[in-house]
């Protein structure tokens, strides 16, 4: 019997790498994306490209409009995306986003009878988001194994965060070795409709630094007006 895994896929660099890792580990991969009315909607088209390139069994996108709550520069157009690193948790944090996404992945995993969920959170080269830490992942896994029919009946769920302790350079190096085409991905928080990056947001900065540190060419497509810092 094949082993199934649900992979959370944003369409960015990290989640594409996680998809490649899951495939390399022999999983039949079912990708789940969330259309939460994010500012950088080009990442949803990127997710489609990545799933096709890396051979996912299925890709589903769930629509859940988090802009009705706002509270983040990624869901509220009145909040500007910062161009320089800030102190504390940045305004690009989307309240409870990873918890929502993992909950949806958990529901689908139960239906698929899959015991494994992959997420691309990273605790080193990240922006300070509280739901990108190892203790958060462990806590969600503990909750999942208390709250699901499958776990109660003996089919426990494992939450895999293979990038959690990796630098961005480590991530792009491993992904490249696994055949990830990063030109298909979109990381920018304010990418234009064609998926071209701004070059100045925190996500662009971390992505670019990763390729430089890894000694790899940066395949990111930048908008004509992009500022590279």
Swiss-Prot record:
Key words, A-Z: ATP-binding, Ligase, Metal-binding, Nucleotide-binding, Queuosine biosynthesis, Zinc
UniProt cofactor(s): Zn(2+)
Cofactor annotation remark: Binds 1 zinc ion per subunit.
A single GO molecular function term of this UniProt record: zinc ion binding
EC code(s) of this entry: 6.3.4.20
Functional pathway: Purine metabolism; 7-cyano-7-deazaguanine biosynthesis
Binding-site positions, Zn(2+): 188, 198, 201, 204
Protein's UniProt keywords contain Nucleotide-binding: yes
Pfam families, sorted: QueC (PF06508)
HAMAP family hit by this protein: QueC
Main function: Catalyzes the ATP-dependent conversion of 7-carboxy-7-deazaguanine (CDG) to 7-cyano-7-deazaguanine (preQ(0)).
Name of the protein: 7-cyano-7-deazaguanine synthase
The species this protein was found in: Methylobacillus flagellatus (strain ATCC 51484 / DSM 6875 / VKM B-1610 / KT)
């Amino acid at each position: 019997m094949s082993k199934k895994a649900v992979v959370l896929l944003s369409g960015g660099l990290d989640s594409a790498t996680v998809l490649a890792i899951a495939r390399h580990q022999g999983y039949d991969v079912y990708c789940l994306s969330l259309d939460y009315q994010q500012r950088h909607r080009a990442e949803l088209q990127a997710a489609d490209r990545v799933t096709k390139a890396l051979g996912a069994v299925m890709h589903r996108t769930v629509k859940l409009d988090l802009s009705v709550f706002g509270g983040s520069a990624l869901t509220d157009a009145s909040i500007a995306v910062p161009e320089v690193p800030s102190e504390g948790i940045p305004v690009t944090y989307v309240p409870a986003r990873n918890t929502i996404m993992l909950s949806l992945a958990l529901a689908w995993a139960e239906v698929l009878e899959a015991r494994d969920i992959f997420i691309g959170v990273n605790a080193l080269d990240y922006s300070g988001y509280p739901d990108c830490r190892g203790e958060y992942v462990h806590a969600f896994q503990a909750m999942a194994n208390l709250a699901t029919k499958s776990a109660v009946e003996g089919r426990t769920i494992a939450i895999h965060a293979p990038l959690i302790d990796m630098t961005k350079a480590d991530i792009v190096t491993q992904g490249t070795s696994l055949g990830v085409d990063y030109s298909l991905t979109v990381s920018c928080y304010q990418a234009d409709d064609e998926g071209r990056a701004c070059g100045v947001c925190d996500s662009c900065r971390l992505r670019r630094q990763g390729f430089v540190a890894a000694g790899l060419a940066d395949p990111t497509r930048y908008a004509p007006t992009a500022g590279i810092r």
